[in-house]
């Protein structure tokens, strides 16, 4: 009974990016989050409650998903207000979704200012990548964390949440003590492909940033 009454640690996380980048698919991988989602009609968003079990106790991310309304223009400020962290997603098979990352970032920091942000390149299970590791520079210029992910194969699903949890709690020793229950993978991530991407990212991190003042 000692733990009763102890408030659960929770954070509002906003998930942004162009339509079709796989944001909703990504959220639906987490089974309890899909079961417990709520629809906020006034803002036209779905809020998925994702719980991760850590050595510091359970951490809950209330993930706000746009429910596709970004296709009709920018999101209203109410979507971003009081967000404590964010994930910006693009599709590695679509250059335009990466080119739009700076505008999503700009909207985020205009309302939320200094919150931890993870940039995710989704669909790395598809071999026909249009956005390779070397040109992905935006996160380095803006001091964001970056992960390759594949929502359909569950590849690196927990990584963005793990990094954000450590940042938000302020504990570099925080660990997940159990993996979340995820939907079975729809595709299998080729281990050799994953290893190649990880190697490419490591090499890209050591490459000097270009001098020009280009957003990307």
From Swiss-Prot:
GO cellular component annotations of the record: cytoplasm; nucleus
Record-listed cross-link Glycyl lysine isopeptide (Lys-Gly) (interchain with G-Cter in ubiquitin), residues: 71
Residues with Phosphothreonine modification: 24
Source organism of the structure: Rattus norvegicus
Record's protein name: GTP-binding nuclear protein Ran, testis-specific isoform
N6-acetyllysine: residues bearing it: 60, 71, 99, 134, 159
Crosslinked residue numbers (Glycyl lysine isopeptide (Lys-Gly) (interchain with G-Cter in SUMO2)): 71, 152
Modified residues (N-acetylalanine): 2
Biological processes, Gene Ontology terms: protein import into nucleus; ribosomal subunit export from nucleus
């Amino acid at each position: 009974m000692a733990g009763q009454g102890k408030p659960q640690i929770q954070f509002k996380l906003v998930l942004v990016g162009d339509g079709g980048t796989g944001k909703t698919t990504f959220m639906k991988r987490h089974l309890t989050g899909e079961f417990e989602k709520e629809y906020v009609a006034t803002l036209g968003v779905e809020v998925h409650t994702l719980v991760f079990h850590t050595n510091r106790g359970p951490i809950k991310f209330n993930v706000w998903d746009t429910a596709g309304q970004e296709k009709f223009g920018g999101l209203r400020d109410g979507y971003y207000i009081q967000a404590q962290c964010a994930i910006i997603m693009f599709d590695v098979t679509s250059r335009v979704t990466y080119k739009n990352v700076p505008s999503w970032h700009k909207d985020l920091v205009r309302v939320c200012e200094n919150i931890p942000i993870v940039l995710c390149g989704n669909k790395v299970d598809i071999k026909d990548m249009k956005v390779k590791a070397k040109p992905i520079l935006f996160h380095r210029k803006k001091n964001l964390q970056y992960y390759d992910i594949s929502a359909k194969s569950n590849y690196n699903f927990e990584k963005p949440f793990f990094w954000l949890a450590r940042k938000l709690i302020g504990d570099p020793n925080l660990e997940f003590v159990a993996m979340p229950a995820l939907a079975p993978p729809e595709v299998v991530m080729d281990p050799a492909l994953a290893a190649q991407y990880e190697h490419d990212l490591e090499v890209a991190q050591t490459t000097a940033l270009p001098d020009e003042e280009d957003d990307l």
